[in-house]
Amino acid sequence: MAKIKARDLRGKKKEELLKQLDDLKNEPSQLRVAKVTGGAASKLTKICVVRKSIARVLTVINQTQKENLRKFYKGKKYKPLDLRPRKTRALRRRLNKHEESLRTKKQQRKDLLYSIRKFAVKA
């Protein structure tokens, strides 16, 4: 089996990808048998290519799955932890813009009564 490209896999449906994954997973055992029985040299180096192909298929499956989950949870209030943006603990606990802008009644009254004075400098 030739080297599989990820861009070719992205257009396929999930069922096709799973079928291809099963085919690829069966291949290394056959190649190992060929290695023990003294098969051709081309088959010996093929194990590495097959392993990488399995990894590519799994990567594409996982990426499409995560992409679909992102679409599903877009605009919802609660999201799974792995879909939330990666932030430090301190950033997660920080006040948001709305909470920072809130003022107490006393502060609002003070701002209203004693606004900042603006002076014009005479040249």
Swiss-Prot record:
<dbReference type="GO" id="GO:0022625">
    <property type="term" value="C:cytosolic large ribosomal subunit"/>
</dbReference>
<dbReference type="Pfam" id="PF00831">
    <property type="entry name" value="Ribosomal_L29"/>
</dbReference>
<protein>
    <recommendedName>
        <fullName>Large ribosomal subunit protein uL29</fullName>
    </recommendedName>
</protein>
<comment type="function">
    <text>Component of the large ribosomal subunit. The ribosome is a large ribonucleoprotein complex responsible for the synthesis of proteins in the cell.</text>
</comment>
<dbReference type="GO" id="GO:0003729">
    <property type="term" value="F:mRNA binding"/>
</dbReference>
<keyword id="KW-0689">Ribosomal protein</keyword>
<dbReference type="InterPro" id="IPR001854">
    <property type="entry name" value="Ribosomal_uL29"/>
</dbReference>
<keyword id="KW-0687">Ribonucleoprotein</keyword>
<comment type="subunit">
    <text>Component of the large ribosomal subunit.</text>
</comment>
<dbReference type="InterPro" id="IPR036049">
    <property type="entry name" value="Ribosomal_uL29_sf"/>
</dbReference>
<keyword id="KW-0963">Cytoplasm</keyword>
<comment type="similarity">
    <text>Belongs to the universal ribosomal protein uL29 family.</text>
</comment>
<dbReference type="GO" id="GO:0003735">
    <property type="term" value="F:structural constituent of ribosome"/>
</dbReference>
<dbReference type="GO" id="GO:0006412">
    <property type="term" value="P:translation"/>
</dbReference>
<dbReference type="InterPro" id="IPR045059">
    <property type="entry name" value="Ribosomal_uL29_euk"/>
</dbReference>
<dbReference type="GO" id="GO:0000463">
    <property type="term" value="P:maturation of LSU-rRNA from tricistronic rRNA transcript (SSU-rRNA, 5.8S rRNA, LSU-rRNA)"/>
</dbReference>
